[in-house]
């Protein structure tokens, strides 16, 4: 009986653990999904952005008390404008997805939503971390030795 309880606990804890991408694995995933040069944004820019937003963590969440919104997932996409979490007042849901979709290990939906964000007039500047850590910097190290 104890063995079953331990096994059940291990399975439950494994199911809620985040996938944390390795830098090159993330770069290759982005490239396979058409992010290299998408709307003029380099692969290195995307990798830099994700490192500073979530440290490549698919389960990253950050609550913003000022507007009661939350940033979700590897790209830290905000519930005020881009997804629906059922909690954010006056949310727009421009990506047309539940915010929980941005927390999946399979980041296909997160990538599609990030593409939607970057098509907005603000473009990549919508991400504060990109402006603070990536803009006008040599980002070659973010994709070095990744084979992309």
Swiss-Prot record:
PROSITE patterns: GLYCOSYL_HYDROL_F22_1, GLYCOSYL_HYDROL_F22_2
SUPFAM superfamilies assigned to the protein according to its UniProt record, in alphabetical order: Lysozyme-like
Disulphide-bonded residues: 24-146, 48-134, 83-99, 95-113
Lineage top rank: taxon: Eukaryota
SMART domains documented for this protein: LYZ1
Signal peptide (from-to): 1-18
Record's miscellaneous remark: Lysozyme C is capable of both hydrolysis and transglycosylation; it also shows a slight esterase activity. It acts rapidly on both peptide-substituted and unsubstituted peptidoglycan, and slowly on chitin oligosaccharides.
Name of this protein: Lysozyme C-1
Lineage: Eukaryota, Metazoa, Chordata, Craniata, Vertebrata
Gene, per the UniProt record: Lyz1
């Amino acid at each position: 009986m104890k063995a079953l309880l331990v096994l059940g606990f291990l399975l439950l804890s494994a199911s809620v653990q985040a996938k944390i991408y390795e830098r090159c694995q993330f770069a290759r995933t982005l490239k396979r999904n058409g992010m290299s040069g998408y709307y003029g944004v380099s692969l290195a820019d995307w990798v830099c952005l994700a490192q500073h937003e979530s440290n490549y963590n698919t389960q990253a969440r950050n609550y913003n008390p000022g507007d009661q919104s939350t940033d979700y997932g590897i790209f830290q996409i905000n519930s005020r404008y881009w997804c629906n979490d059922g909690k954010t007042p006056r949310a727009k849901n421009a990506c047309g997805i539940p915010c929980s979709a941005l927390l999946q290990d399979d980041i296909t939906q997160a990538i599609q939503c990030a593409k939607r964000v970057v098509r907005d007039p603000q473009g990549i500047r919508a991400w504060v971390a990109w402006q603070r850590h990536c803009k006008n910097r040599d980002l070659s190290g973010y994709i070095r030795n990744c084979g992309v």
